[in-house]
Amino acid sequence: MENIIARRYAKAIASRADINDFYQNLCILNSAFVLPKFKNIIESNEIKKERKMEFLDSFFDIKNSSFQNFLRLLIENSRLEYIPQIVKELERQKAFKENIFVGIVYSKEKLSQENLKDLEVKLNKKFDANIKLNNKISQDDSVKIELEELGYELSFSMKALQNKLNEYILKII
């Protein structure tokens, strides 16, 4: 449910001309969500909505009336806690709009930057898009490339290769 709500807000922001200003301001607020005190203030029903607006305004040197109206809307609808999801969804929509996609390479060992760049170049050609890959360490012996936004997943497992090789040898015998 919260993803649907965040998606609607992000879609509305993505259609604006000042999307980058909104995105930067939301990122500032999003970084504050790691602080428990900030979350307590945002989620508190005891703090008046006007005080919450003043508190959030204090994060910004330059006031943007459109962004302030957006914050008021979130406050009025008690949806400030959706800001992290809105930021995440907005990042996804911006990337889609700019034809940039982020993928994850799962491997047992950390891949070198050179290997990641090589994979990026090959995937860029395959999908005719700008692919950025991050490396995450996993426990299994397989290598897995996941591009969630494009619905692409490729995995190579030594165990699976070994099993297929054994089957092939048994068929020959």
Swiss-Prot record:
It is a peripheral membrane protein. GO terms for molecular function: proton-transporting ATP synthase activity, rotational mechanism. F(1)F(0) ATP synthase produces ATP from ADP in the presence of a proton or sodium gradient. F-type ATPases consist of two structural domains, F(1) containing the extramembraneous catalytic core and F(0) containing the membrane proton channel, linked together by a central stalk and a peripheral stalk. During catalysis, ATP synthesis in the catalytic domain of F(1) is coupled via a rotary mechanism of the central stalk subunits to proton translocation. This protein is part of the stalk that links CF(0) to CF(1). It either transmits conformational changes from CF(0) to CF(1) or is implicated in proton conduction. The keyword Transcription does not apply. Keywords: ATP synthesis, Cell inner membrane, Cell membrane, CF(1), Hydrogen ion transport, Ion transport, Membrane, Transport. GO terms for cellular component: plasma membrane; proton-transporting ATP synthase complex. It holds the Pfam family OSCP. It is found in: Cell inner membrane. Belongs to the ATPase delta chain family. This is ATP synthase subunit delta. Its main location: membrane. F-type ATPases have 2 components, F(1) - the catalytic core - and F(0) - the membrane proton channel. F(1) has five subunits: alpha(3), beta(3), gamma(1), delta(1), epsilon(1). F(0) has three main subunits: a(1), b(2) and c(10-14). The alpha and beta chains form an alternating ring which encloses part of the gamma chain. F(1) is attached to F(0) by a central stalk formed by the gamma and epsilon chains, while a peripheral stalk is formed by the delta and b chains. The keyword Membrane applies.
